[in-house]
Regions:
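Short, low-complexity, charge-dense intrinsically disordered segments
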Residues: 1-7, 11-22, 26
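A cross-family phosphate/adenosyl-ligand binding-site feature
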Residues: 27-159, 167-241
Length: 241
């Protein structure tokens, strides 16, 4: 405790604690998005698009596996192999000069997402291959995607995994159970149809909005089911035994 004499009077100066900068919260959000080689590149595209449109996400750390680049080329005709972020920006509808997306090489285990001391809100792997899911479940990662997911779990941040495989074998299911028990959110790429999608984007977006819900990212679409009574023109029938 410090003392100070001012004009003959003794004052006691109470100690103050400096606020640790890593604990300061902000309305601005940062996430890591990883894309792996499972089918469903459009899920990654629409997730990035809606995160960018949310108005609260200020940085997205993007990591892509080699297989993800190949699948995106086959499914969507886009070449993401270049390290130029302009291609990604165009793919998700951002201006070419946007700095929202920060690309990280798969082998760069010194990148921001590899450290728990770097503050961010969470991570999503979309789509998530069974190989990546298994590596995360085992804790024996070999690349930045695995490491970033491990960090997200150990720091008790939100980790969303979007597996896209069919059928699941017992190993896949056991890995998903293990990750769920560790705190991960498992959201299979299984879109619903009760919202009557008119095109593939509406079909995909229904699942993407659930991903954003679990990440805590606001969006403009209502995803809460309110019952058939709130849908005009619906006929509710019951069957009595």
């Amino acid at each position: 405790m410090d003392f100070r004499v001012i004009r003959g009077s003794l004052f006691v100066l109470r100690p103050t604690c400096a606020r640790h900068t890593s604990q300061v919260t902000s309305n601005r959000m940062e996430f890591t998005v990883a894309i792996t080689g499972a089918s469903g590149s459009i899920y990654a595209q629409r997730t990035l698009t809606h995160m960018a449109a949310s108005g609260v996400v200020e940085r997205i750390n993007l990591i892509m596996s080699d297989a993800a680049v190949t699948v995106a080329r086959v499914e969507m005709g886009v070449d993401l192999r270049s390290s130029d972020v302009k291609t990604v920006n165009e793919w998700i509808g951002l201006p070419s000069h946007s700095r929202l997306i920060q690309l990280h090489r798969l082998d760069n285990i010194a990148a921001r997402p590899s450290s728990g001391s770097h503050p961010q809100q969470g991570m999503v792997v979309v789509p998530c291959s069974m190989g990546t899911l298994g590596a995360i479940a085992s804790g024996a990662g070999t690349n930045l995607i695995h490491r970033a997911a491990d960090v997200t779990l150990k720091e008790s941040r939100r980790l969303v995994l979007v597996p896209r495989e069919t059928p699941y074998n017992s190993i896949h299911l056991e890995n998903m159970l293990r990750l769920s028990q560790a705190g991960a959110h498992i959201i299979p790429a299984s879109p619903g149809f009760y919202h009557r999608p008119k095109n593939i984007n509406e079909l995909v977006d229904h699942l993407v909005f659930r991903i954003l819900d679990h990440l805590g990212v606001p969006h403009s679409q209502a995803t809460q089911w309110t019952g058939l009574k709130d849908r005009p023109g619906e006929l509710i029938t019951t069957t009595e035994d």
